[in-house]
Regions:
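Acidic two-metal-ion nuclease catalytic site recognized across multiple nuclease folds
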Residues: 1, 156-186
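Short, charged, surface-exposed loops that flank catalytic or proteolytic processing sites
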Residues: 145-148, 167-169
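Conserved non-catalytic scaffold segment of RNase H-like nuclease domains
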Residues: 1-109, 123-124, 130-144
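Hydrophobic side chains within alpha-helical segments
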Residues: 94, 116, 152-154
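Beta-strand segments within the central parallel beta-sheet cores of soluble alpha/beta enzyme folds
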Residues: 110-113, 172
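Short, flexible loop segments at boundaries between secondary-structure elements
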Residues: 112-123
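Acidic, divalent-metal-coordinating active-site segment for phosphoryl/phosphodiester hydrolysis
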Residues: 146-159
C-alpha cells in the first residue's frame, strides 16, 4: 500500500469534541489524490462558537445528516487504513468523541500526522500551522473548509515524500515495519 492513505479534517461547532459540523477527506492512491469528499454534519448541539472561523452555523447544518448517518460512508476510508490529519490529536479526538456519542466503536487504523511531518521536513518555518505550510508549498487552501484542509494535509505528506524524508519515523508507532508508506528514503 505505498503512498496510499486518507487525509481527514473535522470542523467543530464549539469546544466540545463531539460537535463535528463538517468532515472532509482526501483519498490518496499511488501518490495521487484521487478523490475528495465533504459532508456537513448536524452536531448534537445548537451552540456554534466557532462560526467565525469556518462560517458554518446551526442554520447551515440543521437539516443535514448526523455523524451517525454519514459514518457508514466514511468508515471504509478509515478502517484498517492509514489516516492522516494535520494536528492529528485534534481530529482523532473529534472522531473518537463523536463515535462515542453515537455509541459506535472506533475502528483500528494507522495514523500519520502531517504536523509532525512538516516539523521534521521544514524545520526552518516560523510555525507549522496548516496555513503556513500550505503557503510555503504553494498549496491552494480555503482554510477551515474541511475538504480543502484534508487535501492540503495530503499534499503536505506527498511533498514531504518528494523531499526525501523517511516518513516511517513520524508515522504512529503502531504502524508495522512491513507497511512502509514511501518505500524508505528516496
Amino acid at each position: 500500500m505505498k503512498e496510499s492513505f486518507t487525509a481527514i479534517d473535522f470542523e467543530t461547532a464549539n469546544y466540545q469534541s463531539n460537535s463535528a459540523c463538517q468532515l472532509g477527506i482526501a483519498v490518496v492512491d499511488n501518490g495521487q489524490i484521487i478523490s475528495q469528499k465533504s459532508w456537513f454534519i448536524k452536531p448534537p448541539t445548537k451552540i456554534f462558537t466557532f462560526s467565525y472561523l469556518h462560517g458554518i452555523t446551526y442554520a447551515t447544518v440543521k437539516d443535514q445528516p448526523t455523524f451517525g448517518d454519514i459514518w457508514p460512508q466514511v468508515k471504509p476510508y478509515v478502517t484498517g487504513e492509514i489516516v492522516a490529519a494535520h494536528n492529528a490529536d485534534f481530529d482523532l479526538g473529534v472522531l473518537t468523541a463523536t463515535l462515542a456519542h453515537y455509541r459506535m466503536y472506533v475502528p483500528d487504523f494507522y495514523v500519520i500526522d502531517s504536523l509532525a511531518v512538516a516539523r521534521r521536513t521544514w524545520p526552518h518555518l516560523k510555525n507549522h500551522k496548516l496555513s503556513t505550510v500550505a503557503a510555503h508549498l504553494n498549496i491552494e487552501l480555503n482554510h477551515h473548509e474541511a475538504a480543502s484542509d484534508a487535501k492540503a494535509c495530503a499534499e503536505i505528506i506527498l511533498h514531504a515524500g518528494q523531499q526525501h524524508i523517511e516518513i516511517n519515523r513520524v508515522i504512529n508507532k503502531s504502524l508495522p515495519e512491513s507497511m512502509d508508506l514511501f518505500g524508505g528514503i528516496y
